[in-house]
Curated annotation (Swiss-Prot):
Organism: Prochlorococcus marinus (strain MIT 9215)
Domain notes from UniProt: The last Arg residue of the ACP-binding site is essential for the weak association between ACP/AcpP and FabH.
Catalytic residues (positions): C119, H261, N291
PANTHER family in UniProt: 3-OXOACYL-[ACYL-CARRIER-PROTEIN] SYNTHASE, BETA-KETOACYL-[ACYL-CARRIER-PROTEIN] SYNTHASE III, CHLOROPLASTIC
Gene Ontology BP terms: fatty acid biosynthetic process
Name the record gives this protein: Beta-ketoacyl-[acyl-carrier-protein] synthase III
Described purpose of this protein according to its UniProt entry: Catalyzes the condensation reaction of fatty acid synthesis by the addition to an acyl acceptor of two carbons from malonyl-ACP. Catalyzes the first condensation reaction which initiates fatty acid synthesis and may therefore play a role in governing the total rate of fatty acid production. Possesses both acetoacetyl-ACP synthase and acetyl transacylase activities. Its substrate specificity determines the biosynthesis of branched-chain and/or straight-chain of fatty acids.
Catalytic activity field: malonyl-[ACP] + acetyl-CoA + H(+) = 3-oxobutanoyl-[ACP] + CO2 + CoA
Gene: fabH
Length: 335
């Protein structure tokens, strides 16, 4: 593309990190609990195994470990970080896990808060954080995606228990006056279809005193209409990415890598086919980790950087999609 002189605040990508628990749950092991098989799961999802957090672990622990490796890659002084945004739907504390990550890191100068948008969460957090940096309010930021959905799965429901795993990923991003590697984005929500994928509250009626009743808090396991979610993803994700390419004056041919939320291999392949992006440009680690919700995109980015697939100045098209229903896309240049 033609070079345009840059005279605004832009975003630079400085580092990545990830963490997955050491407990591995294979398809064969799941098939001992529910009526399924390794072949059935792999043929329909592409997943062979997933990671499950130990009892003593939580989202803040995983997010901290992922963030620390991103900071090390960026070679930052932790005290220079001034913003931490955690994308999660499963905080260890209902009031938020980002402050715990801030504390564990010792990033005492950073504002820290959670953002909840399910499997779109990391992308929405990355977009939000980039806009804070471009507005000139912050200089260095960590964007973390971490989820522990194993705690909210019905392990007797073969439709959902085969899909989800735990993990965390993080990106270290920085404001710069020299260029802007956050090229563009788009975001969408359709609450009318929210019933296709949700994790609803499960409330029990109780009373404080006579005539004053309340609902005690809790949550039901994940509920999903897999067929509707599949149809939603393979239709909406190519549309939003195509619109983003047009808006940013890029073509799919200029994309080095397509990194989608790792929900289902058939979704990844279908989206790539509709955009005419070759399979070799579609990155996937779904087979090893399953759907880690807000962690999938940064986990995949970090893996691809560390195995030298993603290189400096590579163009990455990425899209998150999931509960809400929500979906979005971003176009970035690594570095």
């Amino acid at each position: 593309m033609e070079e345009i002189k840059f005279n605004q605040i832009g975003v630079s990508f400085k580092g990545s990190g990830s963490y997955v628990p050491d407990q591995i749950l294979t398809n064969e092991e799941i098939s001992q609990k529910v009526d399924t098989s390794d072949e059935w799961i792999k043929s329909r999802t592409g997943i062979s195994e997933r990671r499950i957090s130990r009892v003593e672990d939580n989202v803040a622990d995983m997010g901290y470990k992922a963030a620390l490796t991103a900071i090390e890659m960026a070679n930052w002084d932790i005290k220079t970080i001034d913003l931490i945004v955690l994308a999660t739907s499963t905080p260890h504390d209902l009031f938020g896990s980002a402050p715990s990550i801030q504390s564990k890191l010792g990033a005492s100068n950073a504002v820290a808060f959670d953002l909840t948008a399910a499997c779109s969460g990391f992308l929405f957090a990355l977009i939000t954080t980039s806009q804070f940096l471009k507005a000139g309010n912050f200089k260095r930021a960590l964007v973390v995606g971490a989820d522990q959905l194993s705690s909210f799965v019905d392990w007797n429901d073969r439709r959902s228990c085969i899909l989800f795993g735990d993990g965390a990923g993080a990106l270290a991003i920085e404001a710069t006056n020299e260029f802007d590697n956050f090229i563009g984005f788009d975001m969408r929500t359709d609450g009318e279809r929210g019933c296709f994928l949700n994790l609803p509250s499960k409330n029990n009626e109780d009373s404080i005193i006579d005539n004053i009743e309340f609902l005690s808090g809790g949550f039901s396991p994940i509920q999903m209409n897999g067929q509707e979610v599949y149809k939603f993803a393979v239709k909406e994700v190519p549309i939003i990415l195509d619109k983003l390419f047009k808006k940013t004056n890029y073509s799919s041919d200029e994309v080095d890598w397509l990194i989608l939320h790792q929900a289902n291999q058939r979704i990844l392949d279908s989206v790539g086919d509709r955009l005419k992006i070759p399979r070799e440009k579609i990155l996937s680690n779904l087979e090893k980790y399953g759907n880690t919700s807000a962690a999938t995109i940064p986990l995949m980015i970090d893996e691809a950087i560390r195995n030298h697939s993603i290189k400096q100045n590579d163009i990455i098209a990425t899209s998150g999609f999931g509960a809400g229903l929500s979906w979005g896309a971003a176009l970035i240049k690594w570095g």
